[in-house]
Design a protein with these regions (language model features):
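Ankyrin repeat domain, specifically the short helix-to-loop turn at the C-terminus of the second helix
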Residues: 265-273, 298-306, 331-339
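Leucine/isoleucine-rich amphipathic helices and adjacent mixed helix/strand linkers
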Residues: 5-276, 287
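Ankyrin-repeat helix-start
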Residues: 251-252, 283-288, 316-321
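Ankyrin repeat boundary signal
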Residues: 274-277, 307-310, 342-343
Length: 343
């Protein structure tokens, strides 16, 4: 690892020296080269122009915590999102040349050609990636300056990513075929797939994110339908859920499955039907039981969820918890009258 880091350090210095236009600039640069990889990354981050900093941080947050590599088109749309504006996304603000996205993060990111395994019809795609694994390690360490570190703490970064994804999905409050959404809005599939994963980590800590979750679940039916026609988190193997013609399940169901306890509390306070049918697990209680969210299971039961409700993949909540090995939930359901078999 030490040798690899030295090569990485040398590569960064060569990148810095490329900007020297004459001998004097070269001398000055050589005299002030950082001695370690940490110092090198710190200098690169501090050297990002102020007008580029917001976009650079967002790109680095996505790449540091992303569940999968970002296509360049996804990254371009991610930095267009304005979570504070009335119109969260406007395509006219996309970069004319997507490859220019490299300028935001200097030596920290690279473009890589990769095989496409998604919905793009082309054989090859271009992905934006961190230039080296040591960058992720540095950004998630305790060695950053405080004013930068706060952006890369897990909860803050994942709250930011989830909010961007939800803001993007809220823009899709129109009736469009799923195929057209994927073609016109490159970040839509990623947002639909991952927003709830990021939100589950940060929901209870970030009021802005809570507001976006509430708006998404309660106020924009087309955005909601488009999201779950792109991806159903309870059926991740299904690439085309919309083709089966089944309507998405209730907001309470997906919030329960995703572990969003604050959203579950809010939806119940607004009169959501705790026993509503729909989804792979048939109801919110079975979804939460199968996913292992014991606090949500307890909450749903306290609000009148039928502990022996039938339906779904496992038949009932107890079987879902047993099948997934969630012993604490099994004990909880049994204590609330769940029957081990139903006649």
């Amino acid at each position: 690892m030490l040798i690899v880091n030295r090569f990485r350090w040398a590569a960064c210095q060569l990148d810095a020296l490329e900007n020297c236009l004459n001998y004097k600039m070269l001398q000055n640069a050589l005299a002030s080269l950082p001695k370690t990889l940490d110092e090198t990354y710190a200098r690169i981050l501090h050297g990002i122009p102020e007008e580029h900093k917001q976009n650079a941080i967002r790109i680095l947050q996505f790449l540091t915590y992303s569940e999968q590599p970002l296509r360049i088109e996804e990254a371009v749309d991610a930095i267009v999102v304005d979570v504070e504006a009335d119109q969260h996304f406007d395509p006219k603000y996309r970069m004319p040349n997507p490859h220019d996205i490299l300028y935001y993060c200097s030596s920290l990111v690279v473009l890589v050609s990769a095989k496409d395994h998604s919905y793009n019809e082309d054989d090859k795609i271009v992905q934006l990636q961190l230039a080296h694994s040591s960058i992720r390690e540095y950004l998630t360490s305790n060695r950053l300056d405080n004013n930068i570190a706060q952006n890369f703490q897990e909860i803050a970064a994942k709250a930011s990513i989830a909010t961007v994804c939800l803001a993007y999905l809220l823009h899709l409050d129109v009736e469009l075929p799923t195929k057209e959404i994927r073609q016109r809005f490159p970040l839509a599939q990623y947002s639909a797939r991952y927003w709830i994963t990021y939100a589950a980590v940060a929901e209870s800590k970030d009021e802005t994110l809570q507001g976006f979750i509430t708006e998404f679940f309660c106020c924009h039916r087309s955005s909601y339908r488009n999201c779950y026609n792109l991806y159903r988190p309870d059926q991740p193997w299904d690439d085309e859920p919309a083709k089966r013609g089944e309507e998405p399940a209730s907001a309470l169901y997906y919030a329960s499955f995703g572990g969003l306890i604050n959203a579950v509390k809010y939806l119940l306070s607004q009169g959501a039907d705790v026993n509503a049918q729909g989804g792979f697990y048939s109801n919110a209680l079975q979804a939460a039981s199968g996913a292992g969210h014991d606090k949500i299971v307890e909450l749903l039961l306290s609000k009148g969820a039928d502990v022996n409700a039938q339906g779904g993949q496992y038949g009932n909540a107890l079987q879902a918890a047993l099948g997934a090995g969630h012993d604490k939930i099994v004990e909880l359901l049994l204590s609330k009258g769940a029957r081990s078999y139903i006649v």
